[in-house]
A protein has these predicted regions:
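Short glycine-enriched, charge-decorated loop/helix-capping segments at active-site entrances
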Residues: 36-42
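Glycine-rich, highly charged phosphate/nucleotide-binding loops
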Residues: 43-48
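Conserved phosphate-binding/catalytic loop of the ribokinase/pfkB sugar-kinase fold
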Residues: 119-123
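Surface-exposed amphipathic alpha-helical tracts and adjacent flexible/coil segments at the periphery
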Residues: 1-22, 26-36, 49-52, 58-86, ...
Length: 676
């Protein structure tokens, strides 16, 4: 059995120290942008270097999260972040954006790549494709059962990581547009506002029918390790250090076979939503998994914080370090340090002449004294500093860090990095065509003359006229149904279907296995030109761009593959495996449709199919009156969900002729306002 790795969240330097001192084997953290927890404190460049040095001194690995979607305008920032990670000695990078993954693989080939759970990979076929794309590890979805995890472990060519404690989203990770559409704060961009924790009710529901209890699989760690899971992840980069310490210690006890019921009670007290759930793992889905944070939960947390601080009390810093700093005009700066019998000396850059405010001795003292997180205590600091010099804080930090590394003998091992000029090849579109997706084939109109292609649910293609231009849609929630879906795709191929659409890597691979042309659909999260290029390299035929980008961003995305935008329909806000309607009635009572109602009375339709539920937006996107503003696109997607045949005919005519006025309530989606 592989030695289990306990992977702890570090949303701040304080949480990182708590994780290390409590027994974590690895931590994951983010820099100030481009990570899925932008509201956490996170780490600046210097803090990242110090965090890596501190962790490596304690034989703890550091995984950097770059697990968000990145726009074309942010690609240079992303490359700079990869360079920083290489220089700092980060042990792996966690990625969601397939274009960023390819960029890392080219510029930093020695950097291990971990596929974020935001990539929504659910099958062995998807894991094998990740291996081909250069990934060494995948973070599995939280929605998997024990049997599904076991099957993936038996067939995976990459390491597998599972969440074992922390917050549980209602939506499958990477498939949520809820926060983005309701408030322009994208969960795919690290800015989720958690609207699902607000009151949403199904018929006869609890009033909070999108809010799940926190996950806890700590009791199953040994069992999962025997199956082949190599890393056990704790969610919580926005949580307090006390929470991190308690969760790490509880996981460590589980690995070591230690029973500590009092610590478990404290862990529940420090943060829970009416307790914990293991429903997905045990394949016991239903109302027992739902919960909210009540007043009693908050009161319990305040009562255990002081107690939990003792889990990560400060290490004994038994060595005093004295510094001597010299900065003279025209000469390289120098820093000498003495700790016990050991002396070290290093030189830096020649200081600059100050253009405005000169660096003071006090400022130098403040930076050199920052030895927290090391085994040293700061002693005397002698400073010889000429007047009128400017010394960047980063240079002082670098000198201090290198001196401490020499004293400690734990210099981080950097990885090679070769910067790349990111050139975006402009796209030139052909004629803008209509592609129509129908959830119900009975709503397909009779007149197809102006429709490029009709998309129907996989399995319904043989109910549609064979002479028509038909393609099929693979469900986004595949999970353990991969073999059944592959057989259906093969049947579609035999029937004469040539193209299929998928919103996950799993679906794309299954489509290719069945001999069909794959198209990237909703859920593929195509946000930049590098992602387009990567998908083209995988053989993708057509690409639906992310509904979270603006028209201006979409028009600027490069590449050759035909691409389009979501131009009409109710955006699918959530893909859920635990149906919210189970809070109000059993599956036997359900007619595959329902609705959620928010606190203002706004209704969101629910569509249940293929073992999952989709929560749709309350109103459709409508752009037929602004067709001239949809430029440089090869197609427009009209996404029909619960419309009648009469309504679909009317909408299609609007987009053929160019309507001057929308029918009823509508939204422009995110095509103008975009997301954070």
């Amino acid at each position: 059995m592989i030695k289990p790795e306990i992977l702890a969240p570090a949303g701040s330097p304080q949480a990182l120290i708590a994780a290390v001192r409590s027994g974590a084997d690895a931590v994951y953290l983010g820099i100030k942008n481009l990570n899925a927890r932008r509201s956490a404190e996170n780490f600046d460049d210097e803090q990242l270097r110090e965090a890596v040095a501190y962790c490596h001194k304690h034989n703890v690995k550091v995984h950097l999260t770059l697990n968000t979607l990145v726009s074309d305008g942010e690609l240079e920032k992303a490359q700079e972040a990869v360079q920083l990670a290489c220089e700092a000695g980060v042990d792996a990078i966690i990625v969601q954006d397939i274009g960023i993954a390819e960029l890392i693989h080219r510029t930093a080939p020695d950097m291990p790549l971990h596929a974020s759970t935001q990539m929504s990979v659910q099958t062995a076929a998807g894991l094998k494709r990740l291996k081909r794309l250069g990934f060494t590890r995948a973070v599995l979805p939280r929605e998997l059962s024990k049997e599904e995890i076991k099957k993936l472990c038996e067939n995976s060519p990459v390491e597998l990581e599972c969440f074992v404690h922390g917050a549980l989203c209602m939506c499958v990770s990477g498939q949520c547009l809820f926060s983005a559409v309701l408030g322009s704060r994208s969960g795919n961009r690290g800015a989720c506002a958690q609207p699902c924790r607000l009151p949403f009710s199904v018929e006869n529901g609890t009033g909070h029918d999108l809010s799940l209890k926190d996950l806890s699989l700590i009791d199953y760690i040994s069992e999962m390790a025997e199956m082949g899971v190599c890393s056990f992840k704790i969610e919580g980069r926005m949580k307090r250090p006390e929470y991190v310490a308690a969760a790490v210690k509880a996981c460590r006890n589980s690995v070591d076979g230690v029973t500590d019921n009092a610590l478990r009670d404290d862990l529940r007290s420090v943060f829970s939503r009416s307790g914990f759930t293991d429903g997905y793992y045990r394949n016991k889905l239903g109302y027992d998994m739902f919960g909210i944070r009540r007043k009693d939960d908050v009161t319990a947390a305040s009562g255990v914080l002081k107690k939990l601080e003792k889990l990560y009390e400060k290490e004994k810093a038994d060595t005093v370090v004295d510094f001597a700093f010299t900065a003279l005009k025209g000469e390289p700066m120098s820093l000498a340090a003495r700790a016990g019998a050991k002396n070290v000396f290093i030189e830096g850059e020649v200081p600059q002449l100050a253009m405005n405010k000169a660096t003071t001795a006090e400022a130098v003292h403040n930076q050199l004294s920052k030895v927290g997180g090391t085994r040293f205590l700061c002693g005397d600091i002698d400073i010889e500093l000429d007047d009128g010099l400017f010394i960047p804080v980063s240079e002082l930090n670098k000198l201090r860090r290198e001196v401490i590394e020499k004293l400690d003998g734990n210099k981080a091992q950097s990885k090679s990095f070769t910067p790349e000029y990111i050139k975006i090849q402009p796209h030139t579109s052909g004629k803008k065509r209509l592609i129509c997706r129908f959830a119900d084939i009975d709503s397909i109109p009779e007149n197809w003359d102006y429709i490029e292609q009709v998309i129907v649910p996989l399995g319904d293609e043989q109910k549609v006229k064979k002479s028509l231009r038909v393609s099929v849609e693979v469900p986004r929630g595949i999970f353990s149904n991969d073999e059944k879906i592959l057989e259906k795709l093969k049947s579609a191929n035999e029937y004469g279907i040539t193209e299929a659409w998928a919103g996950t890597l799993d679906g794309i691979v299954l489509i290719q296995k069945a001999g069909l042309k794959p198209n990237a659909f909703i859920g593929s999260n195509v946000f930049n030109s590098l992602s387009v290029k990567s998908l083209e390299g995988m053989g993708i035929n057509r690409i639906l761009l992310s509904p979270e980008i603006t028209l201006a961003q979409a028009q600027a995305i490069g590449g050759d593959a035909p691409r389009g935008v979501f131009a009409y329909g109710r955006l699918p806000l959530m893909l859920t495996r635990n149906c919210p309607q189970k809070n109000g009635k059993s599956c036997a009572e359900c007619k595959r449709t329902g609705k959620l109602t928010d606190r203002r009375g706004i209704e969101f339709p629910i569509d249940c199919r293929s073992g999952c539920s989709e929560i749709l937006n309350s109103v459709p996107v409508y752009m037929a009156d602004r067709l001239s503003e949809i430029r440089n696109m090869d197609f427009m997607l009209l996404y029909f969900t619960n419309e009648s045949k009469e309504k679909t005919s009317l909408v299609i005519q609007d987009y053929i002729k160019g309507s001057k006025k929308p029918h009823g309530e509508f939204t422009r989606g995110l095509l103008y306002r975009g997301v954070e």
